[in-house]
Amino acid sequence: LTKYFSEDIVEGILQDEHANSLSGRHQEATIMFFDVRKSTTIAENLEPQVFAEFLSEFFTDIMDLVYGNHGSVNKLLGDGIMSTFGCPVPTANDVLNAAKCALQIRNHLATFNDVRPDYIKEPIRVGMGIATGKVFAGNIGSVRRMEYTVLGDPVNLASRLESMTKEAGVDILIDGNTRHRLGNLIKCRKVQHQGVRGKLQEIEIFSLDELLKT
């Protein structure tokens, strides 16, 4: 369980406080997608074992930040991570925790690039997308393989926001729902009302600049 959830959530599950939360339900959650840009180029310039070790160590640091902000790692996506805040147990701070996590990843990346190994020739760049809303979360599968899965519009939107960061020239994009729930806790800039693939209507998109207060 500690591979997926933060220690406080695991403790609740083991004490049977949140065990039913894993069986499946509709709930509010904040989703964050994280992706390492140009990872294919990095991989092509390194021996496979070296690249695997680099990515594993780098992801360990990122996942520690997710867990440290009461998030959960839902999926490893090759060169990316899907994490959730509020699954399986929603709290009043899920949106704020996701924003804190993204900003801490930004700061960690700046430090990493200053001391990165010689074999990483160019600074590592990443993109992050955050969206908030109703999702389905629960165990799906069979006796052979079971997986805790999170599905819903916020998952798709967070993924698309992450993919839009490069074009927007920023590292973190959030949807309007996330932005409005954070209120005056953050400094952000509206990118624009923009069409997103799979969405019939344009949505508000913001870049996340900094945390003002908590």
Write out the residue ranges for each language-model feature:
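Cytosolic regulatory/linker segments at or just downstream of nucleotide-handling modules
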Residues: 135-137, 158, 164-214
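Regulatory cytosolic signal-relay segments
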Residues: 1-27
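Acidic/histidine metal-binding catalytic segments
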Residues: 77-78, 118-129, 171-178
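Alpha-helical scaffold within the catalytic cores of cyclic-nucleotide enzymes
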Residues: 55-71, 87-128, 153-166
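Catalytic strand-loop-helix junctions within cyclic-nucleotide turnover domains
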Residues: 84-94, 128-148, 165-169
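Catalytic NTP-binding/metal-coordinating core of nucleotidyl cyclase/transferase enzymes
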Residues: 19-100, 148
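A structural signal for short, well-ordered beta-strand segments
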Residues: 31, 81, 126-132, 205
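A generic structural signal for short hydrophobic patches within well-formed alpha-helices
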Residues: 10, 39, 82, 178-179
